Amino acid sequence: MGKRRVDEESDSDIDVSSTDSETELESTQQQQQQQEGATTIQETVDVDFDFFDLNPQIDFHATKNFLRQLFGDDNGEFNLSEIADLILRENSVGTSIKTEGMESDPFAILSVINLTNNLNVAVIKQLIEYILNKTKSKTEFNIILKKLLTNQNDTTRDRKFKTGLIISERFINMPVEVIPPMYKMLLQEMEKAEDAHENYEFDYFLIISRVYQLVDPVEREDEDHEKESNRKKKNKNKKKKLANNEPKPIEMDYFHLEDQILESNTQFKGIFEYNNENKQETDSRRVFTEYGIDPKLSLILIDKDNLAKSVIEMEQQFPPP
């Protein structure tokens, strides 16, 4: 697979050197302003993003960390090492983004696991059970997932439809503009694999992702049992007061902006609570706002044609700088 590089602008040409002739106050102030501006410019970091094939010898621990991040509060329910092995096994498709060469840790990964061919693998069984339990409240979504992901009367290889699990995760400060080329390369690799009669002839793709709800800061509960009952009474009183006021609109946002495009091209999607949601951490997850961040699980099922359509829309909406 070829590499693609995104080059950013080089160092600034602004000259901020002082001169002995600048003795007047106005000149000194101008010089200080230039120096402050130069400091800001120098703090801008230029980074080259290089695209690499996934490497089992190098990317295993980073992939586990990305999986831990992707599964949120429920990451402890799965054997992440086994999932990482499935992602990185020989001849797998997918891409990583690195900045310091092939042997450095990735800043982002995108790959796919063949769920249909791995229905009997323990960790995949566990993952499917988890997903089916989550989608019980969405009947149509749940029914199609059961048809695609459970062993009924047919054998794995005789199934009419095959499903892939897309694993897409990155550092939170990675620009979304790196994602369209990663998806495009994934589609190209799977197309070549189809020609070689490999295991990537998918009809559907399941995407596990994350969103978050912005919530008012919550007061941490005191662990002292003597104060617990008093706190519960206070909370009940607060709820009664809030009930008399107009309800605040629920604010949701995306960790992965490309998920909005994927969701717009499918009817099978949903946002769900984590099993192990830690309410006490909501307030500590505040970033740059007065609100806390309450993460949620996002599940998207999209067919092959609509995934290809989504990638084109990603390229249009998130073009390279």
From Swiss-Prot:
Region (Disordered) location: 1-39, 220-245
Domain of life per record: Eukaryota
InterPro entries on file: BCP1_family
Basic residues bias spans: 230-242
Record keyword Transport present: yes
Alphabetical keyword list: Cytoplasm, Nucleus, Protein transport, Transport
Cellular localisation: Cytoplasm; Nucleus
Biased composition (Low complexity): 15-39
GO biological-process terms attached to the record: protein transport
Disulphides: none
Pfam families: BCCIP
UniProt keyword Nucleus, yes or no: yes
This protein's GO CC annotations: cytoplasm; nucleus
Function: Involved in nuclear export, actin cytoskeleton organization and vesicular transport.
UniProt family annotation: Belongs to the BCP1 family.
Protein name: Protein BCP1
Organism: Candida albicans (strain SC5314 / ATCC MYA-2876)
Taxonomic placement: Eukaryota, Fungi, Dikarya, Ascomycota, Saccharomycotina
Encoding gene per record: BCP1
